[in-house]
């Protein structure tokens, strides 16, 4: 824009000086007189004067004033230019220290870093938290859930004991009666046969006090386990593989005393 205005002003000045110079030449030609002897005309200064002005001649236009230094300016400045370059909008106030901020702070920033929500109470010591505490912070660090009662004194216990522990060790079953005085395998139902052992067991009543195939309802007898009780004293004559009576192996031998039924 400045270049265009400068060229337009130069063209206007050149077009205005053209007819003025022609009028001055036409006026100076008939009124020109030879200079007196010994007098020399002055040379033109800076190219603005073509010669000495004619004495007594008319001048159509006096100079309006000295031309501006450096070229014509279309518009004078309205005020001093801003330092540092043109600015489209003047600042409405002092700029914030540290850089532009879109929103001014509503209060003092919390210690420890920016938070999206302002705290509803005093900030907790130890760092930013997303949600403010509804009461005083717990001593020792944040806890998700407050304890409902006093903590256990020694450690976590899944189930409290329902009674006093056993004094010596685990006992599967308490004694329901007095133990027997000694191991008694089986009493004899009668005198043993004189001919050898027999395969069938006695059909009489069970012996009082001896072990039976069913488990005892009281503590084990003092003396140790016994694998198999003896059915009676061995025969006096030694074991015999075959009975003395030939052909009578399926039944009892003749003359065998039977016990009480």
From Swiss-Prot:
This is Proline-rich protein HaeIII subfamily 1. Transmembrane segments: none annotated. The keyword Secreted applies. Residues 15-261 are annotated as: Disordered. Residues 1-15 form the signal peptide. It is found in: Secreted. Keywords: Repeat, Secreted, Signal. Its main location: secreted. GO terms for cellular component: extracellular region. It comes from Mus musculus (Mouse). Coiled coil: none annotated. The lineage of its organism: Eukaryota, Metazoa, Chordata, Craniata, Vertebrata. InterPro entries: Pro-rich. Residues 238-261 have a biased composition (Low complexity). Residues 32-44, 51-237 have a biased composition (Pro residues).
């Amino acid at each position: 824009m400045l270049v265009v205005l400068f060229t337009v002003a130069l063209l206007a000045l050149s077009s205005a000086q053209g007819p003025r110079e022609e009028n001055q030449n036409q006026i100076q030609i008939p009124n020109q007189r030879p200079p007196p002897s010994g007098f020399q005309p002055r040379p033109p200064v800076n190219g603005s004067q073509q010669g000495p002005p004619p004495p007594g001649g008319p001048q159509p236009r006096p100079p309006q004033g000295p031309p501006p230094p450096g070229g014509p300016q279309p518009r004078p400045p309205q005020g001093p230019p801003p330092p540092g370059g043109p600015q489209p909008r003047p600042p409405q106030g002092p700029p914030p220290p540290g850089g532009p901020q879109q929103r001014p702070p509503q209060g003092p920033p919390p210690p420890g870093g920016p938070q999206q929500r302002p705290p509803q109470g005093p900030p907790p010591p130890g760092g930013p938290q997303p949600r403010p505490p509804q009461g005083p912070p717990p001593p020792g660090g944040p806890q998700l859930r407050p304890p409902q009662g006093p903590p256990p004194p020694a450690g976590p216990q899944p189930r409290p004991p329902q009674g006093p522990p056993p004094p010596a060790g685990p006992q599967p079953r308490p004694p329901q009666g007095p133990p027997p005085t000694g191991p008694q395998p089986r009493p004899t139902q009668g005198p043993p046969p004189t001919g050898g052992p027999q395969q069938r067991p006695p059909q009489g009543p069970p012996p009082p006090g001896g072990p039976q195939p069913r488990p005892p309802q009281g503590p084990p007898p003092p003396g140790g386990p016994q694998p198999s009780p003896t059915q009676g004293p061995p025969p006096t004559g030694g074991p015999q593989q075959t009975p003395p009576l030939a052909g009578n192996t399926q039944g009892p031998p003749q003359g065998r005393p039977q016990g009480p039924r």
